Amino acid sequence: MPHKIFPQYEESIYIDANINILSEYLFNLVKQSDKVFMQPRHFKNMCIYKEYEDVLNAMLDDKKLILDELEFIKEAGMPKNYGFGENNILYRKHNDEKIIKINEDWWEMVSNYAKRDQLSFAYLLWKNKINIKDSTFENSRLQIENFYVFGHKKGRK
């Protein structure tokens, strides 16, 4: 968790190993923003329920864990079409109390439910009143002038 690893810093950017940064775009976005969190919009889904469906159909995780998590977020009242981000780039003001809570709860959810971290993260943003649609930028796969995204290996969960 970045607030534990980097307490001396105010903010951090997590970037998946399969992404190369090709420009100053991301850094300029961060400099110009007052948000405590930002991530790219998901390349395909804008609804967490559609992503659950896709993850189940592609068998990307344990079916029981996915269904248990899906039931949990439904019971909590997670709305449809709230927005959905991709966790391949995460900007966080990681010492912010709300972000600390999200990160700690995220660890608990990934430890106890599906390992597909985008699912639980989107729920936790909603639960902690971070508007996904206001906190996302164009997907990195679509910004070929700013990012190069390598494909994941087939059969990887």
Language-model features and meaning:
Residues 1-157:
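Glycosyltransferase catalytic domains, chiefly GT-A lineage
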